[in-house]
Amino acid sequence: MNKILIIDDDRELCALIKRSVQSEHIEADFCNTGKEGLQKLKEQEYQLVVLDVMMPGMDGFETLEEIRKENSLPILMFTSKNDSISKVRGLRAGADDYLTKPFDMDELIARIASLIRRYTRFNQQIGAVQKLDFDGLQIDLENRSVTTSNGTFELPPKEFDLLLYLSLIHI
């Protein structure tokens, strides 16, 4: 069963989202601070994070930055700010999707399901392959590194996943 982590300081909203995704056979944990969320991500495996921007202490952007240092799972951000600057900042920092509060719960659930579907399908495709070889380029899936004639490189998680995705389309 797929499992998501909801990080938001609004406990009632977390409980509502948890109940809503459970009706779609998706398990959910929630926590109310960015630090708690980072700890849960170290302890358990999730297929998606739902992350609020406006939280006391470590805000959603800082939390997103920390998550992206270690993890490439999909992240859906939301906020009550309805300005394009926040949306663009979140997407550029590594969020996969962005919703503005108030949002329609059915739309949120559909976006969550869509992101999980793409993530799990992508991981199933690469699960059987250890290395991809192209003319002058080798992608090592086990070590998450890229080798060219100029040497071996470790890319940030999002960039590695994008390169891998584009390579799989090429095959």
Language model segments and positions:
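Conserved sequence signature across two-component system core domains
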Residues: 7-8, 31, 49, 99
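Short, Lys/Arg-enriched segments at the junction into DNA-binding effector domains
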Residues: 3, 114-160, 164-168
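Charged docking surfaces used in two-component/phosphorelay signaling
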Residues: 15-23
